[in-house]
């Protein structure tokens, strides 16, 4: 088969990753030019509200194409339906796909033949596997499992080791990691109400860390999807911790994690709790102060994590790829416990 003149590609291309790179590169190896038809925001965000905007997705592909030296051979277009120009294009002679989208390409070719047009050469491209051997996909990235390079943010053998925080991180981790919403310490619902007003309906989970935060949310009848408590506040026993109505949580888990340590027990318990569809309470024997670090690394993108900042209010941080990158940077400094 000779080289193709113009290859068509269609899709969402959310969180442009190594699988997308492989798909585009393969089509470019067999074609002079490639038209990428990006699904518009209305359709894409109906599929998943966490899909990035068309403009951002367009810019990410453009930046990759420029860096790879393909700018002159790739053009980007808005796709408003499932098939775009493929059934009627007289310029295109090829179409790229993966195994899942192969049936759509076959339907397109059938429509072309009925219209008296030549069928498109189908370039079927294999998926790329991540570090765990599973397919790299935008959905797994949005689920918070892997980064765009196909590597787990936290997984494998690291899930089964204890890690101690070095003293050099003390000052950094004392600072609010997120947006601080201030309010009187005597009435934490004031600060919490400000934080809740910011969280969008599309957030997959509301996650609370700390007895005061969890107690406040329950009192406000805003039951978190996942909550961590250790019976203390300001590193002292908190008598009111016993008053928490645990019956609002469908599932209860208990783990151990001493102060300054992230244990395998905490990691595995957090991962399991995040998979629960019902409200889950995690009781930490020890200290839950470092739980947000693990939560952000394991949680789906878009999750809202709240914790208390003593004497100041409530800190809210949304789990994003940037959040995961920073938490990964911090955990890389932790030392392994023997």
Kindly give the residue locations of the regions a language model identified.
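Long, charge-patterned amphipathic alpha-helical coiled-coil/hairpin "stalk" segments used as oligomerization
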Residues: 264, 284-301
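Glycine-enriched alpha-helix->loop->beta-strand junction motifs that scaffold or abut catalytic
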Residues: 91, 222-224, 301
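Nucleotidyltransferase catalytic core that binds NTPs
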Residues: 1-193, 199-202, 211-220, 231-232, ...
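Short helix-capping/linker segments at secondary-structure and domain boundaries
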Residues: 149, 300-303
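Short alpha-helices
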Residues: 101, 288, 296, 305-310
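Structural motif
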Residues: 204-207, 225-228, 252-253, 279-283, ...
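Acidic/Gly/His-enriched mid-domain segments of enzyme catalytic cores or analogous surface patches
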Residues: 212-213, 218-279
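A generic local secondary-structure boundary/capping motif
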Residues: 196-197, 217-218, 294-297, 304-305
């Amino acid at each position: 088969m000779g080289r193709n003149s113009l290859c068509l590609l269609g899709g969402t291309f959310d969180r442009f990753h190594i699988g997308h790179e492989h798909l585009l590169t393969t089509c470019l190896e067999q074609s002079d030019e490639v038209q990428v038809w990006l699904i518009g925001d209305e359709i894409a965000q109906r599929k998943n509200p966490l899909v990035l905007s068309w403009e951002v997705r367009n810019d990410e592909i453009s930046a990759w194409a420029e860096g790879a030296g393909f700018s002159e051979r790739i053009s980007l277009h808005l796709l408003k339906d499932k098939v775009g120009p493929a059934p009627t294009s007289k310029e295109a002679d090829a179409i790229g796909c993966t195994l899942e989208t192969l049936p759509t390409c076959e339907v397109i070719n059938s429509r072309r033949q009925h219209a008296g047009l030549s069928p498109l050469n189908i370039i079927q491209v294999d998926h790329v596997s991540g570090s765990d051997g599973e397919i790299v996909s935008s959905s797994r990235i949005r689920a918070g499992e892997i980064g765009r390079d196909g590597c787990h943010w936290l997984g494998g053998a690291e899930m089964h080791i204890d890690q101690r925080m070095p003293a050099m991180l003390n000052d950094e981790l004392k600072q609010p990691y997120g947006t601080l919403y201030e309010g009187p310490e005597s009435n934490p619902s004031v600060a919490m109400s400000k934080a809740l007003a910011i969280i969008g309906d599309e957030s997959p989970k509301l996650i609370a860390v700390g007895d005061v935060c969890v107690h406040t949310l329950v009192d406000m009848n805003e039951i978190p999807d996942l909550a961590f408590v250790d019976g203390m506040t300001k590193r002292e026993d908190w008598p009111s911790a016993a008053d928490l109505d645990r019956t609002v949580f469908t599932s209860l888990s208990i783990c151990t994690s001493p102060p300054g340590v992230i244990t395998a027990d905490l990691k595995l318990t957090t991962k399991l709790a995040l998979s629960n569809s019902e409200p889950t309470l995690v009781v930490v024997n020890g200290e839950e102060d470092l739980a947000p670090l693990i939560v952000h690394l394991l949680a789906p993108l878009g999750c809202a994590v709240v914790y208390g900042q003593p004497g100041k209010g409530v800190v809210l941080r949304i789990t994003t790829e940037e959040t995961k990158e920073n938490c990964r940077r911090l955990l890389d400094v932790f030392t392994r416990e023997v």
